[in-house]
A protein has these predicted regions:
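A short acidic-to-branched-hydrophobic micro-motif
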Residues: 374-392
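Sec-dependent N-terminal signal peptides of Gram-positive bacterial secreted proteins and lipoproteins
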Residues: 2-26
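Beta-propeller-forming repeat regions
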Residues: 19-363, 371-373, 392-395, 401-413, ...
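C-terminal partner/receptor-binding element of secreted or periplasmic proteins
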Residues: 419-442
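Secondary-structure transition/turn motif
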Residues: 371-378, 416-421
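Small/flexible residues
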Residues: 4-6, 412, 418
Length: 442
């Protein structure tokens, strides 16, 4: 019985990766992880102090998975962390230092000090973009223009750090592979501004020129004002892509699936077509994610269940459909349908045997009831899922005829099955239990 569901499906929380930089998710504790020992910390802070010469202020990245001003990461694979610190000196309010430090023979030393004219660090990430054994440092810095940042890249090896030419502007960037080569690329996403068009750009490393170059770019929806959630992953048939959930000014959500077409050597973004409605446009806060662990990114679409003529006091819920995206046909392919009770944190997977347009579901206080939809009106009740206060359930209050599916510290979730054996909607009790999921079980 499946009794939990990722927050990506329900959209009940904003994921860590929504801020940009990287599709991997870390806990806040990991993101703010300090140097490994007090001795190391003291040495690192002394190096920062010596470099600042007169006092300093640590600068914390605003977005991404690495939010600490002092980030510990093994850059060269020797199982010993290097340290990357961001700060500005006492009289350097418009300049930020990125100090790279390594430990050699038990003593911490400076491996690179890079000064950038900016006031804030947007985000930091690490990725293998040069195919060398070392991880590169990707640092994004803010500008005075909202939603416009600029990218810098550095590589560390044998105790020294050097610059990889970058300098691209972006609103958010993400690292990952769009093919099976094992080599990472950098995908920059740009929101529309007065100076920049909305687009996605795939950056790759040019070994001879020691620089990141734009391999391909594609237009994005200019009406998106914020990227809510972004994930690298497989679409279908071993084709990898980046799936971007963005928000309009109206708070409506829309998804764009971007992939590199090897035959044409171009980036494609087929779900966005100028002057055409994106089929993923929705008001329900559900996001793209691999929700069933099949390594395929699932893209949500939302539509209202049948409700014409139903009393306005009856709240008909939405049907959330999980789809895969096929690069071959550039189409969405339906996988599963769900009905969700957001107020009480549970949902029901719609049986595959139920035909679209023949059923509907209503949310009423703590319950969700399913009905047949016949002759354009509510038909017979099929089954109900109800959330009971856990203490009231234990006392047997108003729960006659209900069978518990799941209980936590707050609620007991129970069902009442009204389907009959000769009906096309017939479900066994076990099928109802299996179709049920809760959000964030305690």
């Amino acid at each position: 019985m499946k009794l939990k569901l990722t927050a990506a499906l329900l959209g009940a929380v904003v994921l860590v990766s929504a801020g940009g930089c990287n599709f991997m998710e870390l806990s806040l504790e990991d993101a703010l992880r300090p140097p490994k020992t007090m001795g190391d910390e003291a040495e690192i802070e002394q190096l920062i102090s010596n470099s600042a010469k007169g006092g300093y202020t640590l600068k914390y990245p605003k977005n991404g998975n690495y939010r600490s001003a002092i980030i510990m990461r093994d850059l060269d694979g020797d199982k010993a962390d290097e340290a990357i610190a961001f700060f500005h000196g006492k009289d350097e309010t418009a300049k930020i230092h990125m100090l790279v430090m390594n430990e050699s023979d038990g003593k911490w030393q400076i491996a690179g000090d890079y000064v950038t004219e900016t006031t804030d660090v947007d985000c930091v990430d690490f990725s293998n973009i040069t195919e060398s054994p070392e991880l590169e440092i990707l640092a994004g810095y803010t500008t005075y223009t909202p939603n416009v940042n600029f990218l810098s890249c550095y590589t560390y090896s044998n105790g020294t750090t050097s610059t990889i030419q970058a300098g691209q502007s972006y609103s958010a960037f993400y690292c990952g592979s769009l093919d099976n080569s094992g080599k990472d690329g950098v995908m920059t996403l740009n929101l529309f501004t007065a100076d920049n068009e909305a687009k996605a750009t795939l950056l790759e490393y040019d070994k001879e020129k020691r620089m990141l170059f734009a391999k391909a770019s594609v237009s994005m929806d200019p009406n998106v004002v914020k990227f809510r959630h972004v994930v690298f992953g497989e679409l279908e048939n071993n084709v990898k892509g980046i799936v971007v959930d963005g928000a309009y000014a109206s708070d409506e959500l829309v998804t764009q699936a971007i992939y590199f077409n090897n035959d044409l050597a171009v980036l494609r973004n087929p779900l966005y077509r100028e002057r055409y409605k994106n089929p993923t446009l929705r008001t329900v806060g559900v996001y793209s994610e691999d929700v069933d662990n099949d390594r395929i990114v699932d893209i949500p679409t939302v539509e209202k269940l049948p409700s014409a003529g139903v009393d306005s006091a009856v709240k008909i819920t939405d049907k959330v459909t999980r789809n895969t995206f096929s690069p071959a046909g550039e189409t969405l392919n339906r996988k599963n349908d769900y009905a969700i009770n957001f107020d009480y944190g549970f949902l029901v997977k719609i049986p595959a045997t139920w035909q679209s347009g023949t059923y509907t579901a209503a949310v009423e206080n703590t319950s969700m009831k399913f009905f047949a939809w016949q002759d354009k009106k509510l038909g017979s009740e099929l089954f109900e899922i109800r959330s009971f206060d856990a203490a009231a359930w234990d006392q047997g209050k108003d729960n006659d005829g209900y069978t518990v599916i799941y209980r936590d510290n707050r609620y007991a979730y129970a069902f009442r099955n009204e389907t009959v054996a000769d009906s096309p909607f017939y479900l066994t009790d076990n099928e109802i239990k299996t179709a049920f999921s809760v959000l964030n079980p305690s």
